[in-house]
Amino acid sequence: METIVRYSKFASNPHGDGGSKRSVQIEELWRARNVDFIEEKFVLPKNYSVIQAMIWVLRSFLFISKYVGWNKFIGLKEKVKALLMYALRLPVIYDKYKGKDITFLWENTQDLPSLYMMKAAGAKIIAYPHNLESLVPTQVDITTHKQSPYWLYEEVERLKLCDEVYAISKEETWLLQLFGINAKYFPYYPPKAAEEEFLKIKALRDEVKKYKIGPKSFLILGSATNPPTRMGMQCLIDFFASQHDLSYTIYVGGYKSETLDCKPHSQIQYHGTLSVEKLQELLIEVDGIIINQPTTSGALTRIVENRIAGMPVYANFGAARDFYNLPDVHVYNTFEELVILL
């Protein structure tokens, strides 16, 4: 039986955020193949001596020299930080899997220790980058400390170490192929449990539409802890709050959305972090979901989900990546165009 090892920072939650759902999708894909699926935590042994810790630190120093290269860490601060980050995990990973016939699924592409050590241990590496981190606004490379997008080449070189690479969007697949990586397109689709919920919402929406009267309503939805999403949500709030003659209601909700600058307006309702029940209630009621993001990488999972739920999506050009030219995804370039579409 094939052994699959995965280490992911995302909790496998079919009802969680986009990263968690993508992780569940990948897990369901592999478990369906009847493999030995190991969710690795890379935790240290509970009891270890000071001498053992010193040996690990020394081995880590040598591992970085051999497999990573100290020249990749720009500045003394980054070198010290790297040693502390890698110190205990590298030998643990290496000793545990050296010489074993395994396949390692690399999802958290900012986690370099597991990549380099699994490669050194002889594992087959399959990468599932949730997005190209170097192209996400505000992201900083942990080795060079470069700001996005100026460490794209570093990220590409790391992905070249992998045996297979599966990208979440058409655009990223195309870009990686231009760099000589034989990337394949593996789009997001909700885990089974989440898909069932969205199909239920679609059925309820179909019933509500038969009897709905009155003004329209739209939902601005997203996680305010995600920098591009937060920026886009705030831009939408600022725009709609400046409009004095809105003929429809705007709802704003999502994880930590209460931390946004919620400007008062008679036609805007702020719901903050939504319970599952409240989210379902809004998705059944509203006439569409509005999305705005600065240009970034990856693909928005909620566009797929809302299409399954029968929800029209109004997305700016940057947010609509991977979903252009679909009949129920309405793309706008300016807020003036958005108003016309609504």
Locations of regions flagged by a protein language model:
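Nucleotide-sugar-dependent
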Residues: 14, 228, 290-303, 314-325
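Acidic donor-binding loop of glycosyltransferase active sites
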Residues: 163, 284-298, 309-311
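A short, glycine/small-residue-rich beta-strand->loop->alpha-helix junction that serves as a flexible
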Residues: 8-25, 82, 106, 226-231, ...
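Conserved catalytic-core segment of nucleotide-activated headgroup transferases in glycan assembly
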Residues: 188-264, 270-277
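Membrane-proximal helix-turn-helix segments that form the acceptor-binding/catalytic region
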Residues: 84-99, 113-114, 127, 133-134, ...
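Active-site proximal beta-strand in glycosyltransferases
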Residues: 103-105, 118-138
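Donor nucleotide-sugar binding/catalytic pocket of nucleotide-sugar-dependent glycosyltransferases
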Residues: 134, 156, 160-206
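N-terminal subdomain of nucleotide-sugar transferases
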Residues: 1-50, 240-244
